[in-house]
């Protein structure tokens, strides 16, 4: 967003905290790559406590140093802790981004701090993608909400799980066998479109056929897809 407004990204300062697990450390590695690319300064680089119940030490540093961006990755419990303590400590930052917003239901439990939060996601319900089994992305989203009305915002992991079933079905059919190696080879050769997006695996096993996305939580608790920097509400201003 800074670059799109003619500002120097190198002047943006980052404060971040991550759970000490494979997923979150992968996220951290990605942040480090982007920060290096744009010469952005990381002023806080913390590990969340093992029980994910308290990140006040990080937030105290954040209030003192006043970085432009706060990043947190700690699965659902970490997201809930972050949203709760951001609200308790009245953290103001131009950008706040945390993983697992939907699964933690931060928009319902902590609406004040959730307002303006950026939430990375693997999937959007308005993607122009479809398949023969679940239909379009929006159809899958509507069907899921009918079956599980407790979800006001559908976590992308649920869509991911449905897509995984389609991948296995396709691989088993192409392998025409339950032999482990043949099925593995068929999975590795996957190249298909689903309601979740295109799926094709790199040798390392990650899906290289689709990008990541962001959604931003509004004051009404809705999740707005961020397709371009212009879609983003910036800076975030929470009303505590």
PLM segments and residue spans:
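Extracytosolic ligand-binding ectodomains
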Residues: 1-240
């Amino acid at each position: 967003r800074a670059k799109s407004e003619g500002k120097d990204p190198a002047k943006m300062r980052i404060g971040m905290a991550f759970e000490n697990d494979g997923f979150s450390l992968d996220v951290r590695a990605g942040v480090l790559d982007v920060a290096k690319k744009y010469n952005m300064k990381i002023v806080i680089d913390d590990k969340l406590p093992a029980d994910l119940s308290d990140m006040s030490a990080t937030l105290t540093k954040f209030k003192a140093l006043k970085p432009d961006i706060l990043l947190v990755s700690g699965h659902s419990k970490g997201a809930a802790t972050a949203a709760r303590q951001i609200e308790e400590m009245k953290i103001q930052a131009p950008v706040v981004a945390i993983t697992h917003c939907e699964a933690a239901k931060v928009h319902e439990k902590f609406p004040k701090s959730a307002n303006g939060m950026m939430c990375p996601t693997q999937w959007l319900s308005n993607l122009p993608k479809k398949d023969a089994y679940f239909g379009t992305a929006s159809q899958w989203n509507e069907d899921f909400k009918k079956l599980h009305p407790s979800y006001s915002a559908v976590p992308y992991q649920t869509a991911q799980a449905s897509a995984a079933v389609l991948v296995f079905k396709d691989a088993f059919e192409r392998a025409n066998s339950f032999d482990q190696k043949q099925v593995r080879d068929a999975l590795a050769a996957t190249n298909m479109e689903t309601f979740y997006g295109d799926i094709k695996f790199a040798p390392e096993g990650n899906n290289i056929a689709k990008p990541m996305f962001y959604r931003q939580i509004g004051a009404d608790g809705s999740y707005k897809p961020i397709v371009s920097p212009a879609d983003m509400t910036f800076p975030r201003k929470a009303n505590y």
